[in-house]
Amino acid sequence: MPRSLKKGPFIDLHLLKKVEKAVESGDKKPVKTWSRRSMIIPQMIGLTIAVHNGRQHVPVFVSEEMIGHKLGEFAPTRTYRGHAADKKAKKR
């Protein structure tokens, strides 16, 4: 169920401060964050945000289409290596 419109988007305060600081200084370095639950807001457009996936920080370049989505959607946490191959088929 989506978040109520009257509540507005959720964004961690520490991330919001980092974003505002990066925007006013014009800094191009990635903003490092562990907050996967924060929503992408219009102020973040053009910034690169390094989102933690449990192992490393994945760089995410924010574009207009991403507004309203959460940061965690763009940093996958699981690596899919495929299903186990059939051993009988390999021997042939």
Curated annotation (Swiss-Prot):
GO terms for biological process: ribosomal small subunit assembly; translation. Pfam families: Ribosomal_S19. The keyword rRNA-binding applies. It comes from the Bacteria. Gene3D superfamilies: 30s Ribosomal Protein S19, Chain A. InterPro entries: Ribosomal_uS19 (IPR002222), Ribosomal_uS19_bac-type (IPR005732), Ribosomal_uS19_CS (IPR020934), Ribosomal_uS19_SF (IPR023575). Keywords: Ribonucleoprotein, Ribosomal protein, RNA-binding, rRNA-binding. One of its GO terms (cellular component) is small ribosomal subunit. GO terms for molecular function: rRNA binding; structural constituent of ribosome. PANTHER family: RIBOSOMAL PROTEIN S19P FAMILY MEMBER, SMALL RIBOSOMAL SUBUNIT PROTEIN US19M. Belongs to the universal ribosomal protein uS19 family. Protein S19 forms a complex with S13 that binds strongly to the 16S ribosomal RNA. This is Small ribosomal subunit protein uS19. It comes from Photobacterium profundum (strain SS9). The gene is rpsS.
